[in-house]
Amino acid sequence: MKTLINLIGEQPIPNLLPPLYLKSQKNILLYTDTTEKAANRIKRILSDCELKKIDPYDLTMAINGIKSVVKADEETIFNITGGTKIMSVAAYEVAKENKSKFVYLQSEGRRSLLFTYSPEASDYRKPSKEEIPELVNCELYLKAHLPDYYTTGYSMEPNSNRLTSGGEFEEAICDSLDKQKFEFLSGIRPKGVGNQIEIDLIIRLKGTNNVGIAEIKLGDKMEEGPKKGLDQLVMAAEREYLGTYTTRFLITQSNLSKQIKELASAHHICIIDDLQYEFRNKTIKSTAVTKLNDRIKEKLS
């Protein structure tokens, strides 16, 4: 039996991609007081999970905690991507003592690279490197990050089946997305947070595990809509929600001011503005459609 021991951090993706890729039959999730919620969300997704709480800062206690879940008759691999630095050192010590492999996921630069260290490869000094293929979709991504959620689609008038003008623009944006390149869901509402967070769009570049969220706003003279969109994107990317690995877009038909663009840049939010929306027939001009798809693909590649 292949057992993967995962050090759980606040971000779930580093503890989700390796077990999905390695197809581990058993997964042990080592968590702390601050990462228990993340561990429970991962447990909902992976098969045959066991949770074990360990000390995040006492090296001796962390080593003993890890040793208590290692079984001699199982092939054990350690995923040291998450957790605290002390937890990583402890896992390395136990792995080396047991002559076990350990892996580390590098997720920077839009590529998911899994480094595997083994005692046979110059005593752990020459890791192998593999790029992890497409393993997650939008629904799985949301499930890994949120306790629960529901979808409402495009923005509607209160007590009505009619779309608002903003909802019509949201629909035009989604109709303009290249279905061959992207997978997406609209109108995401995390449960348990009231109306604090509303995500207009979650989108994934097919063939990758790279996911983004977007706020879609018509724009107005006072730029209240885009400002609200920025606030939503900043809040949605906090560690308690979709976290730091999620790319963020503010999509609008208006040409935004320098002030808004500088504010977005400070928060690493990509603006796609001036999209030439035709209100009468509720469509976006072909040049703007190309711009929209190219910009999203560029940021998710």
Positions of PLM-derived features:
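Long, low-complexity, Lys/Arg-enriched
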Residues: 1-76, 89-301
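Periplasmic-binding protein-like
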Residues: 77-81
